[in-house]
Amino acid sequence: MGLLDNLLSAGSGAIVTQLTKQFGITGDQATSAISTMVPALAGGLKEKLADSQASSSISQLLMSGGLNSFADNPSSLGSPSALAQGKSLLSSVFGGEDLTKLASGVAEKTGLGSGIVNSMLPVVMTLLGGFLSKNVASGKTSLMDLVGNLAAGPGILGAVKSLAQKVTG
């Protein structure tokens, strides 16, 4: 079972269930959205972690904000705290243009509306942050190894370009 499968099956599928309730989508749509978003979000994190200037602030956001509690309690993903942490991570990792392209690509690939995708991105980023934080805290792996394993190809720029090509294509 891969890391993405571990994330999706955490809590016996409670994450997918929470997203279906929170956004009024089906389980298949939630799974598709997570499966599309996580590699691209991880790619952005991977690029930021490789940048020595940004690495420490991103690591601090991931490891000091209590994010692992969201991995353990998916029902809290809709809380104001979860949304605030997800938005903070997103703004630290992506510029506005890259985030807009990512959201458009995810909407196109999953068939979800752009409003739902834009609302889901901070929640999925919080989920990803919690998953990373929890696994790194266990001491079994490094943040960069986890992010690298979850990232799609060459990172966010490649993911955004690939998604943009599919949208405009």
Give the predicted meaning of each segment.
Residues 1-169:
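A structural "flexibility-hinge" signal
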